[in-house]
Amino acid sequence: MSETILITGSSRGIGKAIALRLAQAGFDIVVHCRSRIEEAEAVAQAVRELGQNARVLQFDVSCRSEAADKLTADVEAHGAYYGVVLNAGLTRDNAFPALTDEDWDRVLRTNLDGFYNVLHPIMMPMIRRRKAGRIVCITSVSGLIGNRGQVNYSASKAGIIGAAKALAVELAKRKITVNCVAPGLIDTDILDENVPIDEILKMIPAGRMGDPEEVAHAVNFLMGEKAAYVTRQVIAVNGGLC
């Protein structure tokens, strides 16, 4: 029987690429979305066409009660997850003086609170498996070096890195690894039109944007058996930006 991995925010973009790559590696996939249910179902079907099982969960990671209810019910019905990829997130970019309370709160609730809201309900079931497990958090270069116009986003992603490193210490003896993958500028259809791509490209030694599949390959490595001794780390996929 294949192990199962939950991937939040996997209806498109990087999350979709991760779902398909992990399915190719032989994992069953729980596709997650907040609102794009048709796109999520399409990803699930693509996973099935790769020979793996897939199902879809729909909930808002920023809503603690909703996340707990949906995840608890899914684990009770299907069993604990082997792995989790925390990919769901959003941006509300603006210069710091121009940020609104909602800009700040929405980003922190989704990106940082989402870490707790998703992992807390499923943590004890993962531990009770008494088997190896994997947690990968998709963070950002912004969480490593900060980025102009992204004080809220940078704070949320840096917070995830800190939380992941602390959780890695707690779970290491239980053979559950916790790591982060920090993408830089990645070419997806959800790239914010306000992102100064030409300006950023000048700062990237590789001279190009990354592909979602390149992020997915890093996640695939961390999910594998050969990464059992890799924990509490941040793998940057950013073309040398930092």
From Swiss-Prot:
Residues reported to bind substrate: 140
Pathway it works in: Lipid metabolism; fatty acid biosynthesis
Residues that bind NADP(+): 9-12, 34, 60-61, 87, 153-157, 186
Active site: 153
Enzyme Commission numbers on file: 1.1.1.100
Pfam family, one: adh_short
GO biological process terms on file: fatty acid biosynthetic process
Reaction(s) this enzyme catalyzes, per UniProt: a (3R)-hydroxyacyl-[ACP] + NADP(+) = a 3-oxoacyl-[ACP] + NADPH + H(+)
NADP as UniProt keyword: yes
Keyword Nucleotide-binding: no
Single Gene Ontology MF annotation: 3-oxoacyl-[acyl-carrier-protein] reductase (NADPH) activity
Subunit comment: Homotetramer.
Family named by the database record: Belongs to the short-chain dehydrogenases/reductases (SDR) family.
Function (record text): Catalyzes the NADPH-dependent reduction of beta-ketoacyl-ACP substrates to beta-hydroxyacyl-ACP products, the first reductive step in the elongation cycle of fatty acid biosynthesis.
Protein name: 3-oxoacyl-[acyl-carrier-protein] reductase FabG
Species annotation: Aggregatibacter actinomycetemcomitans (Actinobacillus actinomycetemcomitans)
Record gene name: fabG
